[in-house]
A protein has these predicted regions:
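Short alpha-helix in the alpha/beta-hydrolase fold that links the catalytic acid
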Residues: 376, 390-398
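Hydrolase active-site cap/lid region
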Residues: 307-354, 409, 417-420
Length: 436
């Protein structure tokens, strides 16, 4: 049965409310809007320029949607994270200030503004791309990259899945059974947990693996997609049940798992993401073991950290038939070595002392290198104003992909997404699952 437009919109809203938790564990609670808006507008609507083409940013400040005239601003202009021009206390003449810039090489030019109004500071920014399709990654591939990961996964599979499935009656619907599941990943006793949703009606179904953004949180599972005729599995990556209260996860995030993305990042085998990545592949093993799986269609999707894990899983496991990353992290870690913004979690950022061991380990966990092994269709989307996963890093990874791919840019998007973007993402996933 085809979904109505209202059903689709309702699902998009549920999807947004579900994934907004990606950021809640990292970003402190704050007001969602402010009375003062700092508007930074490039002179081309698509925010795309050729090398050496001039760009004019127009800066305006609004209060209650009315332009303010007597305001001073500070601004920075230049490549992302490496501004070449900094000015302070610049007055807005007739309510605006024009700032001109250009880039002679492929990359992204950012104008970041702080306005001073009634003793308070307000910020805004705009970012434009200069021949982004020509951006090349800095991160190189170790000679043993492929053999290392083949060996790592072979070792992981020496441990039986030994899955557990606990029905959650309070979450089941008339169409879907919902389970809290777990399975072993890299060694006996080390487990991956998630929420599995299976249509109640007998039959064979496609499957969707949802991988998480950064943070620690409970999961609800993708019940709606399952109700339309697909198996869905939403996993956590931290080896703990995903049905506890948020306060339980907050204590872990502020305690033993604080900055987990840095744990053992000087040791290729002990690095935190080693088990995480193997766990994603074991999740595919688990889905393929289900009698309800059709053994034909299996996708993986996620945003930020989950966007990275989507690419990585699709690259490492040929049973994956499509992948859909939003604003993927973990791209082009080594870009900072050439004074260019690298991806989250910024292991080699300009403010960090570069350790040779970290640099070498990063190469084995860089989306840039996994992307070279992709063979199935992928759907990407991000914004140019993303300050967590800089577009330079994501574009560098995207440009290395030779298999079928789509890129949907929302220029003003930061490290979040618009309703339209989420709907476009979901519709593409449903099309691949043949359920729309």
């Amino acid at each position: 049965m085809r979904k109505t437009l209202l059903e689709k919109k309702a699902y998009v809203k549920r999807t947004l409310s579900l994934f907004i938790l990606i950021f809640c564990s990292i970003v402190t609670s704050q007001a969602q809007s402010k009375e003062i808006t700092v508007m930074v507008s490039p002179d081309k609507a698509d925010c795309l320029y050729t090398e050496n083409e001039p760009c004019t940013f127009t800066i305006r400040v609004f209060k209650a949607q009315n332009e303010l005239k007597d305001v001073t601003v500070d601004y920075e202009l230049g490549p992302i994270e490496y501004p070449a021009e900094k000015k302070t206390n610049q007055p807005l003449k007739n309510g605006k200030l024009e700032v001109k810039g250009r880039m002679s090489v492929p990359g992204f030019l950012r104008c970041k503004v702080t306005a001073h109004v009634n003793g308070r500071d307000y910020s805004g920014l705009a970012t434009v791309g200069y021949a982004p399709e020509k951006i090349k990654p800095v991160t190189d591939m170790p000679k043993d990259f492929k053999t290392y990961w083949d060996s790592t996964l072979d070792k992981a599979r020496q441990t039986e899945l030994n899955p557990t499935m606990v029905l959650l009656p309070e979450r089941c619907t008339d169409k879907v059974n919902v389970y809290h599941v777990s399975f072993q990943n890299v060694r006996p006793g080390s487990r991956t947990y998630g929420i599995l949703c299976i249509p109640k009606k007998e039959g064979k179904y496609p499957a969707l693996l949802r991988v998480p953004g950064a943070g620690i949180r409970p999961y609800n599972g993708d019940v709606y997609t399952a109700s339309q005729g697909a198996i869905t599995l939403e996993i956590g990556i931290h080896g703990i049940p995903v049905t506890m209260t948020q306060s339980f996860y907050n204590n872990l995030f502020n305690g033993a798992l604080k900055n987990y993305w840095q744990i053992n990042n000087t040791d290729r085998d002990a690095f935190y993401y080693n088990r995480v990545i193997a766990g994603c592949i074991r999740a595919v093993d688990f889905l393929c073991s289900l009698e309800q799986f059709d053994n034909k269609t299996l996708g993986v999707a996620g945003s930020s950290q989950g966007g990275a894990l989507s690419v990585i899983t699709a690259a490492l496991d040929k049973r994956v038939t499509f992948y859909a990353p939003l604003m993927p992290g973990m791209c082009d870690h080594l870009a900072y070595l050439e004074k260019r913004a690298g991806g989250w979690p910024h292991y080699l950022s300009q403010s960090t002392e570069v350790k040779e061991a970290v640099k070498n380990v990063c190469k084995y966990y860089d989306v840039v290198n996994f992307a070279k092994f992709l063979t199935v269709p992928g759907w990407f989307s991000w914004g140019y104003n993303d300050e967590t996963c800089p577009p330079t890093s994501m574009q560098a990874a995207y440009n290395t992909i030779t298999s079928p791919k789509e890129l949907h840019i929302y220029p003003q998007d930061g490290h979040f997404w618009y309703d339209e973007q989420a709907e476009e993402w979901s519709n593409w996933i449903w099309k691949q699952l043949n359920i729309n």
